[in-house]
């Protein structure tokens, strides 16, 4: 049996389309609101947080490395997340209890590459860009 094709079937076609929209993954994610609730950022692109500890996350097979990450507690809602620290030696610019700005890490809420369970990356430390610190253009403010 196919779809209704006759005159006066607009209501049926419309209700059928409305019901079947919910089988589409993207539509369901956008309209249920549960994905937004589960997102630590609460729909925002960036969030500030306090560094709790530095952690090393082991890369997934077949790679063998310890990826440098930090545990961050977000200021806006108190949720704890793990954020990747990009570039070589940038973990040295970050200390515990620092305020960091964290952003998403690529794949729309999924982990990236060989780093399991890490969905965020550090962008700024103490209101100074991590990239500027890495390139030597700026220095960390003395506190």
UniProtKB/Swiss-Prot annotation:
The modification N6-succinyllysine is found at residue 54. Its main location: cytoplasm. The modification N6-acetyllysine is found at residue 135. InterPro entries: NA-bd_OB-fold, Ribosomal_uS12, Ribosomal_uS12_euk/arc. GO terms for molecular function: structural constituent of ribosome. It holds the Pfam family Ribosom_S12_S23. Residues 1-26 are annotated as: Disordered. One of its GO terms (cellular component) is nucleolus. Residues 1-20 have a biased composition (Basic residues). CDD domains: Ribosomal_S23 (cd03367). The keyword Nucleus applies. GO terms for biological process: cytoplasmic translation; maintenance of translational fidelity; ribosomal small subunit biogenesis; translation. Keywords: Acetylation, Cytoplasm, Endoplasmic reticulum, Hydroxylation, Isopeptide bond, Nucleus, Ribonucleoprotein, Ribosomal protein, Ubl conjugation. There is a cross-link at residue 37 (Glycyl lysine isopeptide (Lys-Gly) (interchain with G-Cter in SUMO2)). Component of the 40S small ribosomal subunit. Part of the small subunit (SSU) processome, composed of more than 70 proteins and the RNA chaperone small nucleolar RNA (snoRNA) U3. (Microbial infection) Interacts with the African swine fever virus (ASFV) ubiquitin-conjugating enzyme UBCv1; this interaction probably plays a role in the viral regulation of host protein synthesis. This is Small ribosomal subunit protein uS12.
């Amino acid at each position: 049996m196919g779809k209704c094709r006759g005159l006066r079937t607009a209501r049926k076609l419309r209700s059928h389309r409305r019901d079947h929209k919910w089988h589409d993954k993207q539509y369901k994610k956008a309209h249920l609101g549960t994905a937004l609730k589960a997102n630590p950022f609460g729909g925002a692109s960036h969030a500030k947080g306090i560094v709790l500890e530095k952690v090393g996350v082991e890369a997934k097979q077949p790679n063998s490395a310890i990826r440098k990450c930090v545990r961050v507690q977000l200021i806006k809602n108190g949720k704890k997340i793990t954020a990747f620290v990009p570039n070589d030696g940038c973990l040295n610019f970050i200390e515990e209890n620092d305020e960091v700005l964290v952003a998403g890490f690529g794949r729309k809420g999924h982990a990236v590459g060989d780093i399991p369970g890490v969905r965020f990356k550090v962008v700024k430390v103490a209101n100074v860009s991590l990239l500027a610190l890495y390139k030597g253009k700026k220095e960390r403010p003395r506190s």
